[in-house]
């Protein structure tokens, strides 16, 4: 499965899916209003986790992606 097919499949489950180089970050707000994410690299699931949402944000902001990228040392390609 190529990255585009994986992204399309993940969009059926997750709220937002973003590709950064070889990585795909899939992110959603779970039933506890926290941010649930999974990271894929080259089509394979690599890691994932939950980021608490103490401010009760109702939408996913770019800062959440930035935090995930920093935690997993993923860098934007220029």
Each PLM stretch: what is its role?
Residues 9, 40-41, 76:
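Serine/threonine-rich, low-complexity intrinsically disordered segments
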Residues 17-69:
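Acidic, low-complexity, intrinsically disordered interaction modules
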Residues 12, 66, 70-74:
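Short, intrinsically disordered, mixed-charge
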Residues 1-24:
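Negatively charged, low-complexity tracts enriched in Asp/Glu with abundant Ser/Thr
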Residues 2-4, 73-78:
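Short acidic DE-rich linear segments
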């Amino acid at each position: 499965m190529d990255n585009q097919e994986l992204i399309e499949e993940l969009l059926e489950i997750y709220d937002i899916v973003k590709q950064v180089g070889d990585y795909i970050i899939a992110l959603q707000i779970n039933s506890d209003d926290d941010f649930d994410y999974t990271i894929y690299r080259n089509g394979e699931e690599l890691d994932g986790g939950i980021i608490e949402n103490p401010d009760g944000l109702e939408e996913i902001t770019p800062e959440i992606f930035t935090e995930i990228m920093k935690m997993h040392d993923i860098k934007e390609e220029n």
